[in-house]
Amino acid sequence: MEIILGVVMFTLIVLVLSGLILAARSKLVNAGDVVIEINNEADKQIRTPAGDKLLNTLSSNGIFVSSACGGGGSCGQCRVTVKEGGGDILPTELSHITKRDAKAGCRLACQVAVKQNMKIELPEEIFGVKKWECEVISNDNKATFIKELKLRIPEGEVVPFRAGGYIQIECPPHKVAYADFDVPDEYRSDWDKFNLFRYVSEVKEPTLRAYSMANYPEEKGIIMLNVRIATPPPKVPDAPPGIMSSYIWSLKPGDKVTISGPFGEFFAKETDAEMVFIGGGAGMAPMRSHIFDQLKRLHSTRKISFWYGARSLREMFYDEEFEQLARDNPNFTFHVALSDPLPEDNWTGHTGFIHNVLYENYLRDHPAPEDCEFYMCGPPVMNAAVIKMLKDLGVEDENILLDDFGG
């Protein structure tokens, strides 16, 4: 009798616990459809299955929120305002969102789980973002580790971007061998030196990454990007190579690529202040877009200078275009500094790091550097050095504009 009673009690306990688990699950995960109200506008309302992240849910419904890191929670770009239904803010969001913004409902769409009916607010410009399937026109080396990817927009379509803007590229699952990359002979010695052709990029999940445009709005029908290959750091040689850069470097003319955009916030101020552009590496992209836009589309009369740092002449590109701009526009000057010129360069120009060259040859004797606008994009070390120099010169934050994508 005691055995039977024990079995009955055990069964009852299991049933009660199962019921509690199911009840809790029903509270935590909505298995049916939920409704997401956007900007209190009925025509923007979304009905969708619960369970995915808000970023993916919006994308699946044709609303593309910027996410430079592809939804990993590291870039902080996918900010939205959640009025109801988002739950508590997560620790992964707190490094990107201030307490004041969090109190106002600011969240990262890639971290918010869609579990229940929600009310959110999105900037109106997001609804102008579209997706296109483009064709690769060319994908040529411009420097040892930088390719210029040129894409053709579908006929009849326009990407309405502003200079300094960016697009997102979709990276499909792939297996890419670096040995199959098309690297011209003039650049192969460094690739062999660092044994880079041994790497293989294998990706099983699709992802997104953001890249700034190198073309300016008047160069219609194309998207032009500068993409640096992201190899493992020397101290961690067995780490996987960059997902997106490996994919982009493998592309060949005729291949199809899906992009979305335009996005952006690294835009030129509409003032008469002097503009000083500072770039390095693949940070060339937004510099070219901005400077070409100012001089060729807007015909700006503002005083403009461009200071670009490279290792050697082999790493220089677009320099002939900028030299021509300088000849055609007396208000524009172009300056190059090589940090490690090769003997065959026969270089007689500036040498050293670009922030030092800019200071020693221009800003040190500038009557009012605090009145200039500084636009920069380059490797993180360069950006940090330039910002420190500008702060020491008394330049306010509002006049220091940084694009974090191009380094």
UniProtKB/Swiss-Prot annotation:
UniProt membrane topology term: Single-pass membrane protein
Entry's localization field: Cell inner membrane
Q: Where is the 2Fe-2S ferredoxin-type domain?
A: 32-126
Instruction: Spell out the PROSITE patterns in the cross-references.
Output: 2FE2S_FER_2, FAD_FR
| Transmembrane spans | 3-23
Q: Where is the FAD-binding FR-type domain?
A: 129-269
GO cellular component labels: plasma membrane
- Annotated [2Fe-2S] cluster binding lies at 69, 75, 78, 110
- Output the Pfam families linked to this UniProt entry: FAD_binding_6, Fer2, NAD_binding_1
* UniProt GO MF annotations: 2 iron, 2 sulfur cluster binding; electron transfer activity; metal ion binding; oxidoreductase activity, acting on NAD(P)H, quinone or similar compound as acceptor
Top-level EC class: translocase
Q: Does the keyword Membrane apply?
A: yes
E.C. number: 7.2.1.1
Give cofactor(s), names only.
Answer: [2Fe-2S] cluster; FAD
Q: Name one GO biological process term.
A: sodium ion transport
User: What does the record's cofactor remark say about binding?
Assistant: Binds 1 [2Fe-2S] cluster.
Catalytic activity, reaction form: a ubiquinone + n Na(+)(in) + NADH + H(+) = a ubiquinol + n Na(+)(out) + NAD(+)
Keywords from UniProt, A to Z, are: 2Fe-2S, Cell inner membrane, Cell membrane, FAD, Flavoprotein, Ion transport, Iron, Iron-sulfur, Membrane, Metal-binding, NAD, Sodium, Sodium transport, Translocase, Transmembrane, Transmembrane helix, Transport, Ubiquinone
Family the UniProt entry places it in: Belongs to the NqrF family.
Quote the subunit structure annotation.
Composed of six subunits; NqrA, NqrB, NqrC, NqrD, NqrE and NqrF.
Reported function: NQR complex catalyzes the reduction of ubiquinone-1 to ubiquinol by two successive reactions, coupled with the transport of Na(+) ions from the cytoplasm to the periplasm. The first step is catalyzed by NqrF, which accepts electrons from NADH and reduces ubiquinone-1 to ubisemiquinone by a one-electron transfer pathway.
Q: Which NCBIfam families match?
A: nqrF
- UniProt xrefs under PANTHER family: NA(+)-TRANSLOCATING NADH-QUINONE REDUCTASE SUBUNIT, NAD(P)H-FLAVIN REDUCTASE
This one is known as Na(+)-translocating NADH-quinone reductase subunit F
